[in-house]
Amino acid sequence: MAKIVNFYPVGIQTFENIREGNYLYVDKTKYIVNFREKKMKFIFLSRPRRFGKSLFASTLQAYFEGRKELFEGLAIAEYEKEWVKYPVFHFDMSGAKHMDAETLVSYLNLELLPYEKLYGKGEGETYPNERLEGIVKRAYKQTGQKAVVIIDEYDAPLLDVVHEKDNLQQLRRIMQNFYSPLKKLDPYLEFVFITGITKFSQLSIFSELNNLENISMFDQYSAICGISMTELTSVMKPDVEGLGDALGLTYDECLEELRLYYDGYHFSKHSEDVFNPFSLIRAMNGQAIESYWFGSGTPSYLIKSLQKYHVNVMDIETKGVTIDDFDVSPEQMTSALPLLYQSGYLTIKAYKPLTKSYQLGYPNNEVRIGMLRSLSPNYLSPVSTDNNGLVTEFIDFLYDENIEGAMNRLKAYLSSISNRLSNKNERDFQTVFYLIFNLMGAFIKVEEESAIGRADAVLQLPNTIYVFELKYDGSAEDALRQIDDKGYLIPYTASGKKLVKVGVNYDSTQRTIGEWLIRKG
C-alpha cells in the first residue's frame, strides 16, 4: 500500500481539532471573508447530511471567537486584522433526533446550560426561548460585543417525524418557540448562521426573519461545502497518485474513477462540480473506492417518503422541478424528488431557462448504484444476493464474449421471479430491465442518453461495446432493425472496440425472454 501524505480527518468535524491535529483542511475561509465584506448577518445554508455543514459551522465559531492562531496560512488570515472576540452560541441539533416533546425540551435546556454558567440566568427564565433571549442580552451587556448564534442541523428534530402529523406539530411548536427570539434580538446580534437539510416553511426562523438570506442555491456558494476538482487536484494530488498506485491505475485514471464515483453534485444553476467529502476523504484514507456515504445509512424519513409517493425508479431522472418545489416544506410536498435532492440522493443536472425548471439526476455511481440496489427488491427478487448474482454473472459472460451464456442466465433469472412479473404491463417490464442493466454500472460503464437518443442499454467493456434493444411481445428482428434505423451504434464507431448488437424480445405469456438475436456491428 502506498504511503498516505496527508492525515485525513475521518470522523472529525471540529475545526479546532483538525487544525491542531495537523489534519488535512480544505480551506473554505474565503466564504467567511465574503460574508463579512458583504456585511451579511442572517444566513441559511442547506446541504445533504455528512457534507461538511458542521465543519463549516465550527470554522465560523472559531473565527468569531477570535482564534487567530488556528487560521494561519488560510485565506482569511490575509483579510482579518482585528480578530475581535465575540460571544458565540453554537447549538448542535443533530443530537435531538428521535425525541418526544418532553425529551426535546430537556435537550434544549441542556444546550443552554453551559452558556448560563458563563453569563448567568435571569429570574423567571423558564422556557428555552426565554433562556436564549436572556443569555444573548447578558452576553452583550457583559462583553460589550454583539453575539453570534450558530444553529447546526436546525431541522434534525423534525425530519424523522415528518410523516407523523401529531408528533410533528408538537415538536415544531417547541422548535418554533425556541427560535422565535432571534428576530427581536437583532440589536444584540453580530451574525446568525443556520444549517439544515430542508426548509420547514412554517418555522419562525423563516416566517419572521425576513432578512434571512438562503444561500443554498447561489452560484458563488456552490462549493462552500464539499470538495471541488480544483481542491482535489491541488491539496490532495499526492494521495490521488498513491491511491492510483494501490489500485493499479495511472493518476488520470484514478482521478476519473473518483469523479465517476464521488463527484457530480451541483447546488445551483451554474454550480461547480462538487465531490462528496465524506466518501472522498474515506477513499483517500483507506485507499479504496467503496460506497462510504450511501453505506452509512439511508434516513428513515427518506424511506417513508419513497413509499408514500410510490416513486418509480425510471421516473427519478426524467422529471423536472421548479425553484418553488425546492422551497416546499417536507410535510407539504407532493413528490419525493425535492427531498431526494435536499438529502443528496439527486442533484441538479441542468437548468432550463425557458421553463425555469431544474433537471435532477443521480450525482454519481455511488448514489446511483446504492439507490437502485435499495429499490430493486421492490421490482426484482426480494433476495438481494439473487440480484447481485445475476449482475456479476452476466458481466462475467460478457467479458468472456459469451453473449449466449449471458442471455440464457438472464432468461433463467426472469423465469425464477416470474410470479413477481405476473399481471405486469410493458412499463413494469421496462422497469425490470432498466434496473438490471443499470445495476451493472457498479462494474462496467453503462451509457446515458446521447443527443441522438439511446438504445435500451449500452454496456462498455475494455474491448467490446454491447448495444441492447428490447421489445415487449414483438420480435428480436424488429429490435435489431431499430438499432440500425436509429443509428444507436454511430457514437461508438470510432472507439476502436468491437461492436455487438443484441435484439431481445420479452414474451409476456411466458414471463421471460422469448428470443434474442446477436449481430456484430
Protein language model regions, located:
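Phosphate-binding site recognition
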Residues: 1-425, 440
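Active-site metal-binding core of divalent-cation-utilizing nuclease and nuclease-like domains
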Residues: 139-143, 436-462
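Mg2+/Mn2+-dependent nuclease catalytic core
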Residues: 168-173, 472-489
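Metal-dependent nuclease catalytic cores in nucleic-acid-processing enzymes
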Residues: 178-185, 338-346, 434-438, 442, ...
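Conserved catalytic cores of phosphodiester-cleaving nucleases, focusing on short active-site segments
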Residues: 433, 455-472, 486
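Domain-level recognition of nuclease-like catalytic cores that cleave nucleotide substrates
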Residues: 491, 497-521
